[in-house]
Amino acid sequence: MERKNNYEIQAAQARALFCARDLDAVAREHGLRQEGQWLHLRLLGEPYRVSRRNGRIEREEDGRWLPADGFDETLTIFDLLCDAKPGRHAVGTWRTTLDFGGQVHRGLLENEKPDALELLYDKDPARLRAACEMLGGEALPGADVSYALPFFEDLRIAVQFWHGDEEFSPRLRFLWDAAADQYLRYETMYYALGLLRTRLQALG
């Protein structure tokens, strides 16, 4: 419960900081469509909108706007909108998340045992393919399943999956465009990956 409350507090602080910004300038910087109280953007190929009044976030699903105020979504979106560097642009080459942070959080990304998603996709890789394609992904060479997904603006993120065998466990890996740190902070990349995993699981 304490951990959940800490997440809620941090998300509430992020919303308050966002609402204190010059949101017209934020909209201009990112080319966001404005509609009344709402600022519209696309994240992982999906339509989102953020309230100028209170920072609440919604995602469009089947023609309806649904609350999307999860911790990972909240921190990721506000970092992208408020802390992206001017003049940013993707470069089209790939790096691991650890490449951006000097191996600081290696233990968070390298598990000895396969997790639930890896086991799921090992049995049914079509679920991963379907989810990636629903998010606007384009197939890439390499790995047993490999896609580049639109993330934000021109930034993309790659999803790679290898089946397990007698020697190796199934493996799901994510790669960022090498310029990802122009769009979001290293720490926020972990929240973004949490969001991506949630959306893959929901769609596949």
Which positions does each model-derived feature cover?
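Intrinsically disordered, low-complexity regulatory segments enriched in Ser/Thr/Pro
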Residues: 46-75, 162-187
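Conserved binding-pocket/active-site segment within a compact domain
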Residues: 122-182
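Charge-rich alpha-helical segments
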Residues: 1-12, 16, 36, 54, ...
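Ampiphathic alpha-helical segments that act as solvent-exposed interaction surfaces
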Residues: 66-91, 177-204
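Generic alpha-helical structural element
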Residues: 66, 117-120, 148, 185
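Domain-length accessory/inserted modules outside core catalytic folds
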Residues: 104-113, 117, 141-143, 181-184, ...
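Short Lys/Arg-enriched alpha/beta "domain-start" segment
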Residues: 1-39, 43, 82-135
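Amphipathic, interaction-prone secondary-structure segments
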Residues: 27-53, 138-163
